């Protein structure tokens, strides 16, 4: 892969020569495929190794043809890059102490203003339901019409 020289120099300066070489070599490898399993649906899901920061995430050994899989269309899993699943991990770590302190103060309210296409929103919904049952309100909105 041919990378822009300005980008190469910037990355070397930002993270150091050794780390930038690791990043540049990653650009040469095929992209990984990962899915997030919907724990509230049933059906066969692709097997893979667990994403460290999301117990419902799986990194696949190879990319299947998702559009031919009825479980995909039935919502048993969502195709999502493992790096996007990290947002849910951060959310869970930040919200746990808030929930512990709130007791029965009423439903937890969450507003997602960058909601399209919906992968991170559904990850938040699963996390909230696992932590709170149905004691939450999640409002998702996408302000950019072309993304919605």
Locate predicted features.
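S-adenosylmethionine
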Residues: 1-148
């Amino acid at each position: 892969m041919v990378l822009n020289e300005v980008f190469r120099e910037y990355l070397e300066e930002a993270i150091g020569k050794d780390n930038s070489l690791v990043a540049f070599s990653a650009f040469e490898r095929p992209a990984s495929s990962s899915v997030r399993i919907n724990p509230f649906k049933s059906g066969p899901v692709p097997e893979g190794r667990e994403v460290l920061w999301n117990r419902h995430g799986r990194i696949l050994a190879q990319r299947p043809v998702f559009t031919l899989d009825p479980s995909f269309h039935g919502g048993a899993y969502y195709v999502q890059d493992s790096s996007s699943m990290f947002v849910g991990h951060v959310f869970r770590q930040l919200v746990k102490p808030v929930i512990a302190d709130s007791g029965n103060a009423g439903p937890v309210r969450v507003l997602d203003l960058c909601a399209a296409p919906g992968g991170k929103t559904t990850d938040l919904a699963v996390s909230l339901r696992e932590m709170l049952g149905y004691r939450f309100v999640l409002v998702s909105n996408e302000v950019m019409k072309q993304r919605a």
